[in-house]
């Protein structure tokens, strides 16, 4: 009998403690932000919408190496390589399906030219799913993005039609390795 009364007192005490806790939270600062009215805090390394950048000369950085599409775990990136008259590669089309993208950043890490960069933009809501498929024209921005001075063709030393090896900027003359042998 006393055990039964003890359980009732214990249960009532638990309920009263819960009610007091809920009531006290009514007067505290709210943790939930009302999004459109209050701005959202984004961490410095937040990964949002993907963009394609340009090099300092104004040319698009993407060389259509297809590493981003291979690194993408969900396969939302597709592109087709084309070549200019001087031998540079560029994407004939570059397509990202943002309805499948998980914003993991693996495409940004895989890109050797830093053409793909993730921005803190997260407002991409659309009424139709096909509007979330972005083409190259939608992704290409006018600026260099996070690396303003980087130019892949200056650093890589790739041969360009009409230029001998060793004549590009930041490229040393080729060394004849056989002359170094004893």
Swiss-Prot record:
It comes from the Bacteria. It is a peripheral membrane protein. Its EC number is 7.1.1.-. It catalyses: a quinone + NADH + 5 H(+)(in) = a quinol + NAD(+) + 4 H(+)(out). Keywords: 4Fe-4S, Cell inner membrane, Cell membrane, Iron, Iron-sulfur, Membrane, Metal-binding, NAD, Quinone, Repeat, Translocase, Ubiquinone. Residues 52-82, 92-121 form the 4Fe-4S ferredoxin-type domain. InterPro entries: 4Fe4S_Fe-S-bd, 4Fe4S_Fe_S_CS, NADH_quinone_OxRdtase_chainI. NDH-1 is composed of 13 different subunits. Subunits NuoA, H, J, K, L, M, N constitute the membrane sector of the complex. This is NADH-quinone oxidoreductase subunit I.
């Amino acid at each position: 009998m006393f055990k039964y009364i003890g359980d009732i007192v214990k249960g009532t005490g638990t309920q009263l403690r819960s009610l007091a806790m809920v009531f006290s939270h009514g007067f505290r600062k709210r943790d939930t932000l009302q999004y459109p009215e209050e701005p959202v805090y984004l961490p410095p390394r937040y990964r949002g919408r993907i963009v394609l950048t340009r090099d300092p000369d104004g040319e698009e950085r993407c060389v259509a190496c297809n590493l981003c599409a291979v690194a993408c775990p969900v396969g939302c990136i597709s592109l087709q390589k084309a070549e200019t008259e001087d031998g540079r590669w560029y994407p004939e089309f570059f397509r990202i399906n943002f309805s499948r993208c998980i914003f993991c950043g693996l495409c940004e890490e895989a890109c050797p030219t830093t053409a793909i960069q993730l921005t803190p933009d997260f407002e991409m809501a659309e009424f139709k799913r096909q509007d979330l498929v972005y083409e190259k024209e939608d992704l290409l921005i006018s600026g260099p993005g996070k690396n303003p001075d980087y130019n892949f063709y200056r650093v890589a030393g790739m041969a360009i039609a009409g230029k001998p090896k060793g004549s590009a900027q930041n490229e040393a003359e080729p060394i004849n390795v056989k002359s170094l042998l004893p």
